[in-house]
Amino acid sequence: MKLILASKSPRRIELLTQAGYKFEIIPAQKDEKTAYKTPHRMVKDLALKKAFEVAAKYPASTVVGADTLVYCKGRVIGKPKDKADALKILHLLNNSWQTVYTGVAIVNINKKKLFTGYAATKCKARKLSDTELKLISGKHMDKAGAYAMQDKDDMLIERVEGSLTNVIGMPMELFNKMIKEFGF
């Protein structure tokens, strides 16, 4: 049985590879849209849509989809649109608690199996000056929340309560449990 990751995220690829999984990378192509409004439902729905999009082309394979967002001060924050948006996001997160949500979906069409789940991790951003925020804005345009705490030069996050791998993009504790229960 073949495992496919429906994502081109370097962080997800690295986390799964480090954990010893062998898989193909076939990213989902469609826009990320959902009708849900709550963060945990949004990430589960988007992860499922990504997994189904790829699984439709590879029905005998087990396909993994994932989606990450940041929730802070009542706002859902995805990837920044541009450098100005990244700076606006970083100002919102500055010196604040936020929650990082990642939804995971595992689908195998031929086996008629589908699992979904999500992880939520609380993070505290340190207080940074406008100069420091400008320095890091635009560095992480492909990441929800416009930051990458796994990078040594990213100084935004000072405290994590929960799964560090969730903040990076794939909650490995959840994924390992789900894939085992899935029978892979």
UniProtKB/Swiss-Prot annotation:
It holds the Pfam family Maf. It is an enzyme of class 3 (hydrolase). GO terms for biological process: nucleotide metabolic process. GO terms for cellular component: cytoplasm. It comes from the Bacteria. Its EC number is 3.6.1.9. Its main location: cytoplasm. Nucleoside triphosphate pyrophosphatase that hydrolyzes dTTP and UTP. May have a dual role in cell division arrest and in preventing the incorporation of modified nucleotides into cellular nucleic acids. This is dTTP/UTP pyrophosphatase.
